[in-house]
């Protein structure tokens, strides 16, 4: 038989920390977005234009990656919170059963 030992409060703290990390990533992305998505060619030649286009596209993909990571982090935080609630409920039910 398998046993699981967990601390619901620790799971709740972890969920809060994951959300803080997500919020910080979103905030950092928002701060740099104007600079990274508005790269202008340093000269009026084809190479400069291609380089600027490449950098803007790279920044766009970065922003998409951050947005996807934020979704994953929120889902993970939600799973931690849900797990903490379920473990806390199970513990409360066990206490009632044996009281």
Curated annotation (Swiss-Prot):
The modification N-acetylserine is found at residue 2. GO terms for biological process: protein heterotrimerization. It is found in: Secreted. It comes from the Bacteria. GO terms for cellular component: extracellular region. Gene3D superfamilies: HP0062-like domain. InterPro entries: PE-PGRS_N. It holds the Pfam family PE. One of its GO terms (molecular function) is protein heterodimerization activity. Keywords: Acetylation, Secreted, Virulence. Residues 1-92 form the PE domain. The PE25/PPE41 dimer induces both a strong humoral and cellular immune response. PE25 protein alone induces low response. The dimer induces necrosis, but not apoptosis, in mouse macrophage cells. It also induces activation and maturation of mouse dendritic cells and drives Th2-biased immune responses. Belongs to the mycobacterial PE family. Forms a heterodimer with PPE41. The dimer forms a 1:1:1 heterotrimeric complex with EspG5. Interacts with PPE51. This is PE-PGRS family protein PE25. The gene is PE25.
């Amino acid at each position: 038989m398998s046993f699981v030992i967990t601390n619901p409060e620790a799971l709740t703290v972890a969920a809060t920390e994951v959300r803080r990390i997500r919020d910080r990533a979103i905030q950092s992305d928002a701060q740099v977005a104007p600079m990274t998505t508005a790269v202008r060619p340093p000269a009026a030649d084809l190479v400069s234009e291609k380089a600027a286009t490449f950098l803007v596209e790279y920044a766009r993909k970065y922003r998409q990656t951050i947005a996807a990571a934020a979704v994953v982090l929120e889902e993970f935080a939600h799973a931690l919170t849900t797990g903490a609630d379920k473990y806390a409920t199970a513990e409360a039910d066990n206490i009632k059963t044996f009281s």
